[in-house]
């Protein structure tokens, strides 16, 4: 049975109606701001863009002065943002309608549970599933928090539009509120005036928890267990969705991440969940006002009641409220001990705050849960369980999911930093003076000896230490303290960027050992390798095989339930070898590494370092997960959620629920479903892919690494220099100087190609590789079509290429090419354009479609609708880049270009 994707069921008539209202209010606000004559120029640009007269559009834009350009840019940057909000509202509405009316759709949880329930080991599968979105602060969310708050207000107003139409809400008042939001939005700086600090990034991301993630996850977990129970499967310990966090712990290439930011991240996270618990307790306290005049609580509740400091005469016959008072007192004392603060949203009396020392703290979240369950059990005896279910279920689920820590913080550092620190430690401890000069075999032998036989901390001497080593040691010390204070789940992994050898992994273990986070018997934090480049992916098999064979590692895995996580980097492998090479090498690496783990009795799990775009491993989540290699999901899967993707997916509780449902359902589906195509046929497909990818890699590298004009083209014909100046993240755009390709981060690399509308990382090298394969044998086209129809990996691969071809615009890209200084550099565009045309032709052949996005009609309509508006922004951006690069006075250009970057990113809906 084929189910509908909710994204393809949106009512575009409703979206168009709302966009019409938003556009009208935007026009009125803009006209009031700039006057009729100036607004007439905006309308003229819209008409010219719609007529597709490119030269005329360029001429009219170039005639605008800088002052006019600011207002025009603001208008066209705001319009796609408003369209996005309307589309998000429609999706959220569809989620509610389909769930409330029990309609099926692709990825619906009930259908997924029904599928699993047929398995003999259904309980084990559902109990162990754990899908973890890991929120990161990579610099692709270019909108300010202030702007996001305004868009939230507009979102909520549009959610009530149906009530406006039927008269439940006053239309005039509603319209004026919407107008006010749009007027404020038009006069608010879209881009930050100063570079973000890590602390800003932490608070920005944590804002999604109270409004969306906590209610969505608790609702999802509750529903998950209810559906399992319908099949007589009781899942007491299941946490199908938990959250991860990189901000504050990811110091790879970011000098501003320190022990202090790690402490801050953990503390602020904990504050968020304590605040949630306090609010929920207040609701329970107010709601459950049962009197002993009408019922008798259990002896256990009576005991809690008597421990309460609540001496109000109005509570003497209300044992449940007295019990809640005691529970809150314990929770307040716990927060004070753990975080040094007292939440403002409490109901216990001020004088009782002075006597908290007489109230015991909760030693762990389960003690808190136990007290609540005591009350629930008592109420269940006297009432229908449906009554208590509505009061208690979500807070009890929240305790299991979020504990006192909210989300698990990942630590990450580059392998070169670890090597430097370990070399210094070994030298200062008198163990080895020339560690970095040792062979790989010698390094491994030395490191294993230290880990297995030397219990001391190598830093525990009075010898002076480098600034780098001091900084790193302080971070590990803080990690140890946080785990002791907030529980084991607050930090569970340390990721090593650029893992190129087994010694890289053992060096990480040495650093963890300095504060007893690993010892010869167990590991409190797991060492997680990150394989990023194509070469690293090829070497991963040998590295993991050797690492898992060490006796000490086998002991560590026992303390980690025999799971070993491996992180896969999509961005650098794409930048290194192109889209096909990246995807295929990642696919093969997963398949091989999973088999290695199975052979050695270890469950390999994966952390997917995806970005928002196809070029960074992005694309639709459901399809991306179901496209993973067969048997490669062993209970757990983690993936990064970055930048604007966080707002798109988790901006409100309804779309958050839906996207979490998609992630979990896809993971479970991939775990239990059988391959649609035989293993023998898949083997044939793999053989063909090896040939295609080899060709694609050659084509990609011939341009990117062998054409001497390519780098000049990239730095001149994209806004990379302008993007590097944006205040969109705490992390530098490049590890080295900006014009160094090897040090250029994948995010600005992809972001720049998106802005210039080429979308290069999402398709280059694909067309020629497929065309050459087809030309070699006419039957190959039929094989590729079979692969597209029957192999989820290949279908997802081509669908993503299709999407990015549809978002590219070669006419606009040609204008960016005009920014190049010389003709040789400009010729690079001709190479790119020829490959684009070929790729589009071949993709449509394989898909057997007449047009791009044939399987995503709503996305096609959306792009068709918004293209005329945000295409204008590209031409404005090109004009301002020309003026800015010719003019030594940069101020005005630095204020206009970021507006255009914001608008184009909003229009494309995935920037980096």
UniProtKB/Swiss-Prot annotation:
One of its GO terms (molecular function) is phosphoenolpyruvate carboxylase activity. One of its GO terms (cellular component) is cytosol. InterPro entries: PEP_COase (IPR021135), PEP_COase_bac/pln-type (IPR022805), PEP_COase_Lys_AS (IPR018129), PEPCASE_His_AS (IPR033129), Pyrv/PenolPyrv_kinase-like_dom (IPR015813). Its EC number is 4.1.1.31. The active site is at residues 138, 575. It catalyses: oxaloacetate + phosphate = phosphoenolpyruvate + hydrogencarbonate. Its cofactor is Mg(2+). It holds the Pfam family PEPcase. It is an enzyme of class 4 (lyase). PROSITE patterns: PEPCASE_1 (PS00781), PEPCASE_2 (PS00393). GO terms for biological process: carbon fixation; oxaloacetate metabolic process; tricarboxylic acid cycle. The keyword Lipoprotein does not apply. Keywords: Carbon dioxide fixation, Lyase, Magnesium. Forms oxaloacetate, a four-carbon dicarboxylic acid source for the tricarboxylic acid cycle. PANTHER family: PHOSPHOENOLPYRUVATE CARBOXYLASE. NCBIfam families: PRK00009.1. Belongs to the PEPCase type 1 family. This is Phosphoenolpyruvate carboxylase.
